[in-house]
């Protein structure tokens, strides 16, 4: 059966850290034909530009697995939570375009791993705020949530 397990897992070394270093956005569909081998993207035939955002602190990626025994379905909900400090008119414009589209999102961790969110269906902005903050130490910037179901 194609769903049978093929391996186990030993307890890994404690040599990793949490957090996201950078986020890269590619407009939906610009990747062209994507070749995936062994759960890794090995090639993309499209001509594309990626737009990089540096992040630090309150940004994360979480993948939720949803299975239905009754329906025989399984899908993966990928949720990216981002915090961008400092409100700017340039960012207002770009984040509005991001909310209108459904980009592919590449999440680069502090461990050097890069994970793709929304490879097949893109990622939608499902929530966000532009906040000035109330106190001197509060966030003046943006929070954004992108969600992909694959």
Protein language model regions, located:
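Short alpha-helical segments and helix-capping/turn motifs at coil-helix boundaries
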Residues: 89-92, 130-131
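Oligomerization/assembly interface segments of phage tail-like spikes and tubes
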Residues: 68-90, 138-150
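Compact mixed alphabeta submodule
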Residues: 118-150
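Short acidic, glycine/tyrosine-flanked loop/strand segments centered on an H-E-D-like triad
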Residues: 79-83, 110-129
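Short, acidic/charged, Gly/Pro-enriched secondary-structure junctions
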Residues: 93-117
């Amino acid at each position: 059966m194609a769903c049978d397990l093929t391996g186990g897992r030993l307890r890994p070394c404690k040599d990793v850290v949490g957090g996201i270093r950078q986020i890269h956005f590619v407009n939906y569909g610009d990747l062209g034909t994507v070749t995936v081998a062994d759960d890794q993207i090995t090639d993309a035939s499209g001509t594309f530009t990626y737009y990089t955002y540096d992040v630090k602190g309150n940004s994360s990626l979480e993948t939720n697995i949803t299975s239905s025994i009754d329906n025989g379905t399984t899908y993966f909900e990928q949720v990216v939570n981002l915090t961008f400090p400092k409100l700017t008119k340039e960012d207002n414009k770009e984040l509005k375009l991001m909310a209108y589209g459904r980009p592919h999102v590449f999440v680069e961790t502090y461990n050097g791993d890069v994970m793709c969110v929304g490879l097949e269906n893109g990622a939608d902005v499902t929530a966000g705020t532009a906040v000035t903050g109330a106190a001197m130490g509060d966030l003046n910037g943006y929070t954004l949530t992108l969600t992909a179901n694959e």
